[in-house]
């Protein structure tokens, strides 16, 4: 679902009406998937955190389906430049009871293949080797029921800084640098208000807002740079014999 998020020409009625085509796409899959059916759905980030109807749809997903795995994909692997995407892996109902339509999700496993990874594209192709660590920890069971343990430190994950977030509260420092972690349905409900935008590693290229100067200091610095640039431009115009034009701009 990579068209515009909002749009018209939605011809069917959903349980949670919305003009967001991406959220309608998710509802369509949840409703039409046969009991016991499996899905792996690529969605943009906003599907994981959008409020209102988005929250309702995620609750429906975790209620009616066993959402067992989320793969956070790196940027640059789709045509839309810079789009951030994820893969949701889920089964309609549960393996024990495919017709179950309540409380189907217990634990959600998340693999972060995005943080501190290159931006992929023609010059840096995304290859099978980049997915190999995820395939290993996912296991052979297609329903996500293979024995799993937290902890996977490929692509220099152990060198990553840990974000100051809910995801890292009461978590071992070494475990917090893993790309592969488990979060309970209850934690998602209480700590994230049913947002599935779950991340815990700190991107080395990100800017720490806490270390930035106060807004008035930033504004003063910006103004000083603008005044200096205008002065240099004024001097250049006069050197070029355009003093009258420079005076007219004052």
Predicted features, each with a name:
Residues 1-250:
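A conserved structural/catalytic subdomain of Rossmann-like adenosyl-cofactor enzymes
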